[in-house]
Amino acid sequence: MKYIEEFRDGELAQRIAAHVRAEARPGQRYNFMEFCGGHTHAISRYGVTELLPENVRMIHGPGCPVCVLPIGRIDLALHLALERDAIVCTYGDTMRVPASGGMSLIRAKAHGADIRMVYSAADALKIAQRHPQREVVFLAIGFETTTPPTALIIREAKARQVDNFSVLCCHVLTPSAITHILESPEVRDYGTVPIDGFVGPAHVSIVIGTRPYEHFSREYGKPVVIAGFEPLDVMQAILMLVRQVNSGRAEVENEFVRAVTRDGNESAQAMVSEVFELRPSFEWRGLGEVPYSALRIRAQFARFDAEQRFDLRYRPVPDNKACECGAILRGVKKPTDCKLFATVCTPENPMGSCMVSSEGACAAHYSYGRFKDIPLVAA
């Protein structure tokens, strides 16, 4: 298939890896963070790290939307389903994220709550139209990639006067999170690692373009290379980052030229701006409160805002103390550093959100066997 098979060529991957090994200076460390969960998945699936020299390290960043969703947000959705008799609709991975008291949306569904998995925001609106006597709430999560469809469906609900439909908005923003990682004293208190450059997200960049990343390269001296999802995309991006570091450059480069432009999808951006505005602050799992890092629904669409309609009050909830998901999201620890990984915590029984989504670092490591260094204990 065009644009797929040719980006999975093993021989070409070996040649790119040879260039990385040749150009990475032996006495220097290269710490690169891939922000996108799709990149984390590709790196584990195709064994990219095994092709890199020891002094080139890939750090898994907070780019999985399910992983960064805090417990308190899931609790709000559970409250609507269990106590307000609402039909709650959301994407599949969100159903399994652990919430307070060991509950999750899928467990609440087993207890009788009307919680439904949907493939799109449009599915949730159709459910609201089929059940006009019930309140239907769409739990909307994701980065800039999934925000335009939510904006479109809110606008459509207003036009069609579907008054029993609302959205619990948990959409978050990539540039704000990267800024927070680079400069926040709170994150420094949590602990973090030195970052020499970023592999920029693919789908997000299709929407927002490369322009927003120019701030990081200019203000923080950090190179950014936007990369596609295939293994050769990631390998080439790593090589481009090594070359930037070696030459003392900090620029935004676009490896994913077949899909990403400097200005992105301006029609999608305009639609998002019409329906949403910035929140002053939003809690991220692993990062804490991040200023201006999420969206809320504008006043002219307030009747479709579940937080206002149901007078919801967000309450932060601490993570499971034994789960290292927060530290893994910051790159401080690897999945194999967590004592729950591949023992109590598996994709079938996730203790933390990093094991829920296939884009999560723990799930990717588990699914593709990247944990062979865990010592086996004899029975």
UniProtKB/Swiss-Prot annotation:
The keyword DNA repair does not apply. The keyword Chloroplast does not apply. Fe cation binds at residues 36, 64, 67. It holds the Pfam family HypD. InterPro entries: Hyd_form_HypD, HypD_1, HypD_2_sf. It comes from the Bacteria. GO terms for biological process: protein maturation. GO terms for molecular function: 4 iron, 4 sulfur cluster binding; carbon monoxide binding; iron ion binding. Gene3D superfamilies: 6.10.20.100, HypD, alpha/beta domain 2 (3.40.50.11740). Its cofactor is [4Fe-4S] cluster. Pathway: Protein modification; [NiFe] hydrogenase maturation. Keywords: 4Fe-4S, Iron, Iron-sulfur, Metal-binding, Plasmid. Belongs to the HypD family. Involved in the maturation of [NiFe] hydrogenases. Involved in the biosynthesis of the Fe(CN)(2)CO cofactor. This is Hydrogenase maturation factor HypD.
